[in-house]
């Protein structure tokens, strides 16, 4: 969401103080490459602003930590402390306190900087492999600047069903953008692969481009014979 649109949303919430709150799920915001990170709504609004900020450490650290967190605006914090003062979470206090010290000591910031460098190099290697395996007129890449996945849109694509079958045949774990189209009306989603690279070994990036090319060729040949 552009910064101008974020400001409009905050202005909308501010017109009804105490009655309108924005829930901001800032998933994957830590991983933004090539451009400066956009400010969060919570950061723009300040501690008294109408934003409830949610995030998790499942990507930035590890899913096994099982820790998410919430930043409440001060007008809601007192009510939350009163209502949930006896609440006991499923994560031990030892893990919570360890993470808190990891963050306040500046270690988390340095950890994220190292992760961004590593993931950017991995993304660049995957993009280079795709551009080597596919001609420019065959494939368009999008969503390269943030998150740990990218979109590979095939030009003149075979049916998505053929792509799914070929992916199983070649042992490729990837989603199709149409899997997220609940209405089935987004025609632009057809033939678009969602390629996650967070857990892709660096040494496998080149082979990934070649395998995807074979997958797409097999899907197109299979659809032509039907």
Spans of model-derived segments:
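Active-site-adjacent capping/gating segments
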Residues: 47, 160-164, 174-202
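Active-site PLP attachment segment
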Residues: 43-82, 94
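Short hydrophobic/aromatic beta-strand micro-patches
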Residues: 71, 151-153, 196-198
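Active-site pre-lysine segment of PLP-dependent enzymes
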Residues: 1-18, 28-60
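Conserved glycine-rich beta-strand-loop-beta hairpin in the small C-terminal domain of fold type I
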Residues: 100, 116-127, 139-153, 163-166
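Structural signature of PLP-dependent enzymes
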Residues: 81-84, 105-127, 157
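PLP-dependent enzyme catalytic core of the Aspartate aminotransferase-like
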Residues: 169, 186-226
């Amino acid at each position: 969401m552009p910064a101008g649109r974020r400001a409009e949303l905050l202005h909308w919430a501010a017109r009804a103080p105490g009655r309108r709150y924005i829930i901001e799920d800032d998933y994957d915001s830590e991983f933004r490459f090539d451009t400066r990170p956009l400010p969060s709504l919570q950061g723009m609004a300040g501690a008294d602003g109408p934003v409830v900020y949610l995030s998790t450490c499942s990507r930035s650290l590890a899913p096994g930590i099982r820790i998410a967190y919430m930043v409440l605006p001060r007008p809601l914090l007192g009510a939350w402390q009163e209502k949930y003062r006896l609440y006991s979470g499923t994560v031990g206090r030892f893990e919570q306190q360890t993470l808190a010290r990891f963050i306040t000591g500046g270690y988390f910031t340095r950890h994220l900087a190292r992760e961004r460098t590593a993931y950017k190099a991995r993304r660049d290697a995957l993009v280079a492999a795709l551009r080597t395996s596919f001609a420019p007129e065959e494939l368009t890449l999008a969503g390269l600047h943030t998150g740990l996945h990218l979109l590979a849109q095939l030009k003149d694509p075979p049916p998505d069903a053929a792509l799914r079958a070929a992916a199983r045949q070649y042992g490729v774990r990837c989603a199709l953008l149409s899997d997220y189209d609940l209405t089935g009306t987004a025609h632009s989603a057809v033939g678009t692969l969602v390629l996650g690279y967070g857990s892709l070994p660096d040494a496998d990036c080149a082979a990934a481009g070649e395998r995807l090319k074979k997958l797409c060729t097999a899907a197109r040949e299979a659809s032509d014979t039907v």
